[in-house]
């Protein structure tokens, strides 16, 4: 592997890591709460990396967010006004807004600066 090729290595345990070759780093930022990197990868598409851990990947984030949101939305008789605690990347909001009965979504995240990265 060429030394000039950018790689991101994520540590899963003290004994296990996974490395991802980056196509391009789009944004690097440091907020009061976290270090954020938005990068395009070859295997997972665009990734949001927070504090050196992949938070979300374009290729498979829908699996997590659909499973998080859709059961609650299906079970609630009239989901209209929704409060999301966290969810700064916006995928939870996207899933909620698929439901026509929703009239208002409020999202509160500890790190308001992260929206400018995502």
Regions flagged by a language model, labelled:
Residues 1-47:
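N-terminal auxiliary segments of SAM/dcSAM-dependent transferases
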């Amino acid at each position: 592997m060429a030394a000039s090729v950018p790689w991101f290595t994520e540590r899963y345990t003290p004994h296990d890591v996974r490395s991802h070759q980056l196509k391009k780093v789009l944004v690097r930022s440091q907020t009061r709460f976290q270090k954020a990197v938005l990068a395009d990868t070859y295997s997972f598409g665009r990734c949001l990396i927070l504090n050196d851990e992949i938070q979300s990947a374009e290729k498979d984030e829908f699996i997590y967010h659909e499973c998080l949101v859709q059961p609650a939305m299906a079970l609630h008789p009239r989901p209209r006004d929704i409060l999301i605690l966290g969810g700064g990347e916006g995928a939870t909001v996207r899933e909620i807004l698929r439901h026509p009965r929703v009239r208002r979504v409020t999202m509160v995240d500890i790190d308001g600066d992260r929206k400018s990265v995502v």
